[in-house]
Regions:
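Bacterial Sec-dependent N-terminal signal peptides
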Residues: 1-27, 189-193
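Residues that define the transmembrane beta-barrel architecture of outer-membrane proteins
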Residues: 22, 46-52, 89-93, 104, ...
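Residues on the lipid-exposed face of transmembrane beta-strands in outer-membrane beta-barrel proteins
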Residues: 26-30, 52-60, 72-74, 95-101, ...
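Predominantly the C-terminal beta-signal and adjacent terminal strand-loop region
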Residues: 77-81, 133-136, 144-147, 152-193
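Helix-adjacent hinge/juxtasegments
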Residues: 81-110
């Protein structure tokens, strides 16, 4: 699955770059981030946390209405533990690829992402049975996303919202009884030059 996602991403970038109008830009906003966690076949209760994302993008217009954007985004992800005041924090670099259709500035979008977790850590106090070790986690993440953006007319400013659903099991040696998957809602603003 990883190879397929990367092949699609690079092929899309190559095709778009060959014959397209390109704009570059920046984006930033808030994350409402959580993870689906299961340990020993028991679903763990987690609490979403608010964090942020920031990054750059390149938007390719295939024609007047079909567009694609790709970029590199730092995203602070994770969740709060249900017991104690602990937070699981993932410092992640994501490469999102969005395909969009323009309706007079409103652009529904669907896409995929590949990510690399730079660091996975637990902060704060939790129950004594709860532990996280960075070496127990995969650093490669991937998933799919849905969203929309609105571009102001005759202006580079845009507003966006998206939901990213992680498909990768972030646990090393994970299975259907032991897994961790990302779930991230993003709301932000950006500017295209």
């Amino acid at each position: 699955m990883k190879k397929i996602l990367m092949t699609v991403a690079f092929a899309a970038l190559a095709i778009a770059g060959a014959n397209a109008q390109t704009k570059f830009g920046v984006r930033a906003g808030l994350n409402h981030t959580d993870q689906a966690v299961k340990e020993y076949d028991i679903k763990q209760e987690t609490v979403p946390r608010i964090s942020f994302y920031v990054g750059g993008l390149a938007e390719y217009a295939f024609n007047d209405v079909v567009l694609m954007d790709a970029g590199l985004t730092y995203s602070n992800q994770g969740y709060k533990t249900k017991i104690g005041d602990g937070k699981v924090i993932d410092h992640t670099l994501n490469l999102p690829i969005w395909f969009k259709y323009d309706f007079a500035g409103f652009r529904p979008k669907a896409g995929l992402y590949a990510g690399y977790v730079l660091n996975h850590e637990l902060k704060g106090n939790t129950s004594s049975s709860y532990s996280i070790k960075d070496e127990d986690y995969n650093h490669f993440d991937y998933g799919i996303g849905l969203g929309a953006e609105y571009n102001l007319p005759n202006n580079g400013l845009f507003f966006e919202a998206s939901y990213n659903w992680g498909l990768a099991n972030l646990r090393k040696n994970g299975d259907s009884k032991n897994y961790t998957n990302n779930r991230v809602i993003q709301v932000g603003v950006g500017y295209k030059f």
